[in-house]
Every structure is written in structure tokens, then in C-alpha cells.
Amino acid sequence: MKVIGISGQTGAGKTTFAKELEKTLSGLFSVIYIDVDSLGHEVLKDPITIEALTKTFGKDILTDNQIDRKKLGAKAFESSQNTELLNSIMHPRMVKIVENIISENSKRPKNKIIIIDAALLYKMNLVRLCDKVIYIKADPEIRVRRLMATRGWTEERARQRLFSQDKEPEGFKIIIPGKDSFSNFRRFLSFFKKDYNLLVFENNGTKEDFESIFQPMYFASIFLRYKI
């Protein structure tokens, strides 16, 4: 069994990459995809979590006695202090769920890949559970335009969220810059076969550039199959 963590900057294409990776690897492995953001949505429904959040941020974050994510976000991201308060309540609960999923699947590990899709992979210390990490980045102005186009955010909101997530991590890196399939195949092969634990993908290009990355990744990942 291998655990691959996917992290990245807001608007860089992290979740799109993670879902495409899931499809790419599913022909070779039994793939379990963990969307940590979605786990957070589930945790928000827990009565103990609701009580902790309302004590911290006030009852005006509720709508019909449930957490209103938009109202909570407005308060939680208005200052770094509030963001840390939110994280201190949410993260331990979310991490525990991820740990339980990995523990359960480790009982039958043959030909199994677990993908952890988490914007705060490092800050939540989920990276300690990962064998490999792929980090998706893009230039700030490109990310702002994407967030405004795909999520309908204002420019102010997009820029506010740009800097609320993990910074680019340090470690062994293989930079995947673009569309050269053979070059990318060699990079992915090095990532899967050798002791590199971090791959950084710069997603500054077009949708076609982005999609071109997965065919060489598929062929390179064949080598991973014989190691798990």
C-alpha cells in the first residue's frame, strides 16, 4: 500500500489534479480517494463541533441550527487569529478520520493506493502519513483569475484566500513544467522509482497542457505497481 498526498495553492488545480490522478491509477490499483475538505463539511454537522464553533465565533454563524459555511468563512478568514481558531477546532477531528481510513485499509494493503487531497496537508501534519507528495502550484495572478471564473469569487475574496493555505514545501523536487510527454515520463519515473518524496507541478498552462500530464504518469506508475 502507498499513500500519496496531493496539496497545493488555492486556484492552482489541486483537486482537479487529484481526481485525474485517481482515474489514472484506478486501472492499475485499488484506489481510495480521501477529500479532506469534504470531511470538513461532514465534521461541521457534528453537534460537538457545532457547539465548539458557536462558542468561539458566535451563534450568528448558524442557519436553522446548522453551521452556515459562508457565515463561518466570513468570520474565520477575516484574520489569521480567527483562521487558527477554526483550524484548532476542525483539524484534529478531520485528521482522526483520515487516520482511521488508512488504518482500516492497511489490513488488506495489496495493490492499494490511498490519495489524500488536502490543501493543508502540511499544516495538518497529514504529510507524516504519506509515502509521496505531489504539490500543485501556479502564478498568483493566474490563480486569482481562475478563482473568479470558476467559483464566482470577487477579486478581493480571491486574493484573501490566496495566502491562507500552506506555503510551498521544502524537499526533493521534480518540477513538471509543461507538455513534453517523454520528459514528463522520465520525471514521473524518477519520482516513483527513486527516493524523491516530493513532486512539484507548475500548472500555469492551458487545460490541454494540464491533461497531457496524465498519460506519461500512467506509464510511469506501472513501475510503482511492482513495489506495493
Task: List each model region and its residues.
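ATP-dependent NMP and nucleoside kinases share a basic, alpha-helical "lid"
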Residues: 99-150
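ATP-dependent small-molecule kinase phosphotransfer cores
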Residues: 38-111
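Hydrophobic anchor at the beta1->P-loop junction of P-loop NTPases
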Residues: 6
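Small-molecule kinase domains that catalyze NTP-dependent phosphoryl transfer to phosphate-bearing small molecules
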Residues: 98, 128-129, 149-228
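ATP-binding Walker
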Residues: 12
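Walker A/P-loop
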Residues: 15
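P-loop (Walker A) phosphate-binding loop of NTP-binding proteins
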Residues: 9
